[in-house]
């Protein structure tokens, strides 16, 4: 399975970019033993359309053009579900991998959010809590959760889980 993060906007040099790169590199290294062939990042330039509706529609077309037909898609959106623990995310990724899905695409929208066509294509819509977060930080959180999910699947001690369980 190939992992692909599709994000609107380009991260400037700084701590968010460094953390995103670190988690992506860790996912690639750990994923090799789990059937993960790559963890790629594609940055789509922010639309320059004047109206918000036009911007998110243009960005949606660019996002969906990168999503393979048989891909599993997780959209990161503030209107998504925030009740999925990391173990459940790992279970879903493992199930998609075991079902032969070629790619897992994580989508991070821009400042205007995600168009309904992207939300409709998603297998799951994930929120990182009720707060609105900068999309650069969401990208880091998405990559950290991918890495954490892989550590759970591998039985790696990075994720210690609930000590009471």
Swiss-Prot record:
GO terms for cellular component: cytoplasm. Keywords: Cytoplasm, Methyltransferase, rRNA processing, S-adenosyl-L-methionine, Transferase. InterPro entries: Alpha/beta_knot_MTases, RlmH-like, tRNA_m1G_MTases_N. Its EC number is 2.1.1.177. It catalyses: pseudouridine(1915) in 23S rRNA + S-adenosyl-L-methionine = N(3)-methylpseudouridine(1915) in 23S rRNA + S-adenosyl-L-homocysteine + H(+). The keyword Oxidoreductase does not apply. Its main location: cytoplasm. It is found in: Cytoplasm. The keyword Cytoplasm applies. GO terms for molecular function: rRNA (pseudouridine-N3-)-methyltransferase activity. S-adenosyl-L-methionine binds at residue 109. It comes from the Bacteria. It is an enzyme of class 2 (transferase). Homodimer. Belongs to the RNA methyltransferase RlmH family. Specifically methylates the pseudouridine at position 1915 (m3Psi1915) in 23S rRNA. This is Ribosomal RNA large subunit methyltransferase H. The gene is rlmH.
């Amino acid at each position: 399975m190939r992992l692909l993060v599709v994000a609107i906007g380009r991260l400037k040099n700084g701590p968010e970019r460094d953390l995103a790169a670190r988690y992506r590199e860790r996912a690639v290294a750990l994923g090799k033993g789990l059937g993960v062939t790559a963890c790629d990042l594609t940055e789509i330039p922010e639309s320059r359309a004047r109206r918000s509706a036009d911007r998110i529609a243009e960005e949606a077309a660019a996002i969906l053009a990168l999503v393979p037909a048989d891909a599993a898609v997780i959209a990161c959106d503030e209107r998504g579900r925030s009740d999925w623990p990391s173990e459940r995310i790992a279970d879903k990724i493992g199930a998609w991998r075991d079902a032969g899905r070629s790619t897992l695409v994580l989508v991070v929208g821009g400042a205007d959010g995600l168009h309904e066509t992207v939300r409709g294509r998603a297998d799951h819509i994930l929120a990182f809590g009720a707060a609105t977060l900068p999309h650069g930080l969401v990208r880091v959180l998405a990559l950290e959760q991918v890495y954490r999910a892989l550590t759970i699947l591998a039985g790696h001690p990075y994720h210690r889980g609930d000590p009471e369980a």
